[in-house]
Amino acid sequence: MERAELAARLIAADDAERVALLRSHGALADAALAYLLKDICLEAWASDPARATGAASALELFAHLDSDGEVAACAAWSAGIASLIAGQMERAVTHLDDAEARFLKLDLAHTAAATQVSKLIALALVGRYDEAIECGLGALKVLEAHGDILAAGKIEHNIGNIYWRRDRYDEAEHFFRAARARFQVLDDDRQLAMLDNCLAYIQSLKHNFRSAEQLYDQALERAERIGATVTQAEIESSMGNLALFQGRYDRALDYLERARRKYAEMGMPHESAISELEIADAYLELNLGSEAAEFYERVSPTFAELSMRAEQALALAHHGRAAILLGQTDKAQRLLTEARHLYAAEGNALGEAMVTLTMAQLHHSSGNYPATMLAAEEAEAPLAAAGVWRHLLMARWLRGEAARALGSAADARSVLDATLHDAEAQAQPQVAQRCHTSLGLLAAMEGDAKSAEASFKRAIELIETLRAPLPAEEFRASFFSDKLVPYDEMVRLCLADEETDRAAEALGFVERARSRALVDILGGALKVLPEPRDEFEAELLNQLEELREQLNWFYSQINRPSQKSDAAESADEMAALQQEVREREHKMMEITRQLQHRGEQPALSPEVEVLDIAQLQSELGEDAALVEYTSLDGELLAFVVTDEGVDVIRHLGSEREVEAELEQLRFQIDTLRFGAERMRKHLPHLTKRALHHLQTLYDVLLAPIEEFIGDERRLVIVPHRALHYVPFHALHDGIDYVIERREVSYAPSAVVLRHCLSRSPRPLNHALLVGVPDEQTPRVRDEVVALAPLFPEATTLLDEQGTLAAVREYAPQADVLHLACHGQFRPDNPLFSALRLSNNWLTVRDAYELDLQRCELVALSACETGMSAVAPGNELIGLARGFFSAGAPSLLMSLWTVDDEATAELMKDFYQRLCAGASAASALRHAQLRLMQEQPHPFFWSPFVLFGR
């Protein structure tokens, strides 16, 4: 047996087998074998960490069995490498010091110096920078004296890394280039790949983006060619950071996720933690504050445990930014103070300046503009000295925006103009769009409408360009959430124009900021559920399915009556179950987000889908009017679109007052939620109370627009924020309910409505009718049985037949999908709003997965199925979104808990008219009017609303 074969077998063996191998091959068990195992450990470190640690373990055992000094020294060296891989930096330093001492004792000064290459990494990661540089320079002299070009280059590379960590970029570049020259002489692809990654990062920090990208591409090609997996991950991580820096969020998420997966697969804890820190930074850029905060909370203790102070400080500082985004002022202050102390202990003035910049953001979010200016100005000098343009530009924008808010127009313009110029020169669109928005506000404040409009339009163009490539609807919606100001201001400018009627243009800007992520899905620009591209993603999908099964069990436990006789025990049991549910839902969301990091979505044109007013008017025809609500400064206004034109009705009332009135109405409706029969004798009085609130809402929301819509037109309502919960069809004018005079339907936006209208109607030949009764809905079975004969063909799934698998199987053939089962709206986690099937729950994400391209109508005859959370940009998050995304053009859903018996009667009447040829809106209106005669309280007849066509 050759030594190489013995080494390979020792690495793969367990300890007992290793002892046997060493004893049976004693002639080969010498210092040469120890050096061979040490070399394997060093070589495998960057490509196969498991093999490297295997070599270290074999050497450790070998040293116990052999008293040779060189064997022990090699074992200590390899133990240091294994500790580095495990993230145990202080232990790595101890082992490498031991190795150096043993080699020096053997009078092997050159080999002793070579051990310091690895020691520099450990010293730097625990913040012992001066010691590391002194150690490195000392070792460099010895290595140069012995002509060891490779080890000397590694030392220079690591010294460069130390200067980089201290944000001293010129010194870092000097050592990187010196090391690169040595590696080029040796034509060492492995070292060149690692070195070019570092050099590229320095170039990106200096805003030499083209040079950085060329170096990254070159480094990644080398690393892939030689199979250096760790180096590949490091380069992909760096490329992700560059993309994030440039606002190319799709590439950033994709590269960062690739790196995280590689580190996780190789079991490298400190690299995995750094990778998660970088993904959290990407989330923060996309306004996913809660998600970013969770990552920061997870990795900060890891960095503390590993004594990685620089990374811990960065995590704390960015966690502070997330807290600002979440409105947690005190928490942000505490986190930033802690980060500042760590940076001070590191002697990192630039890190302290970053914290000061974040403090300026905290003051700005609190409206303390004088403090904003002071903090931003304090941060500028060290940021400028380091050439950190992105953060410097953010500090300057904050100073300019604070000056604008304080009314210092001249100072604000000077700062903002200069900042915009530099942001464009440095390719920083994130800062540029902020500057354009601020300059637009400044121009508007000064009465210069033309300049304001130009600035706002440029800001909108940049926002939509940045948003276009994002790979998932959640990322697009969250990114948009704090960028609505220029859209609102363009609406304001259009409406203020006294020379030209720009109502249609104003509506166009409202639409560009409304339900855009849903529009992207309907327009085919987003895949909601991409296919797995590798085994890793396939395993993630398996985890999702396992979590789904666990959740179904917990949901069933929560929804069944408690077996505990003691109320306190029952409450504790319920709290424990709900905690289990929250943990699993959270994990599902995290895995789903991880799957969506991929950068393979079709590119979305920055030219967003614009509302074609003329086409909308043509589709509405003579008998329909679209009423779209929005608000400016908390005051509601409405756009009315008919075939005759576009009108704007302003000063309808304050959003706050409408929300208060709506809350009172919900209280009245909920009075009957838990049993109408026992309240029957009070129904006339309760009806009168409900009417009072319905009339008040009518007076605010519809009375002022009646003259613009005429007496005969049916209404399509596009609500705004809380108005999504208003039953417009049940509003009362003092004589009649609105539904008594006209048909009413709803849409998330005018563009979404146009997508629904673009579907050619199909005959309703085949219905899929699903009925899963429970204690709250005992009439469901009767409801479904009564509906089946109304259709030429019907697939009926009752009781235990009503499974999610069966719905998925039969839905693609259905013209109508009717789901009669218990529904649950989850305001705490709206994506987990669900319908209870026989064996599990159909959530929003399950609805996404259904194939409803043939389906004309989805009807959900259950409680609160039409409720949605309304995210910024009027993004509806609930069951409606799921079914729209799956392809349904029309949805029949409820706004509140429904009465089982009343629902059964209404559905039968509705479908009789629908199957006889009536439109869905007409059929629903007549069914509601008929039920109104028998059950006058709106609780019974008005919960159902029609979304879409």
Model-derived segments and spans:
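Catalytic cores of nucleophile-dependent amide-cleaving enzymes
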Residues: 748-753, 758-760, 765, 773-778, ...
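An often Trp-containing, charged/polar helix-loop segment at the C-terminal end
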Residues: 897, 902-949
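Short coil/turn linkers that connect adjacent helices within long alpha-helical scaffolds
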Residues: 27-28, 64-68, 85, 104-110, ...
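Amphipathic alpha-helical protein-protein interaction segments
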Residues: 449-736, 761-768, 789
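Tandem amphipathic alpha-helical repeat scaffolds
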Residues: 3, 34-47, 73-88, 111-128, ...
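Catalytic-core domains of enzymes
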Residues: 41, 644-647, 655-668, 718-816
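Eukaryotic all-alpha helical interaction scaffolds
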Residues: 62-64, 83, 103-104, 143-144, ...
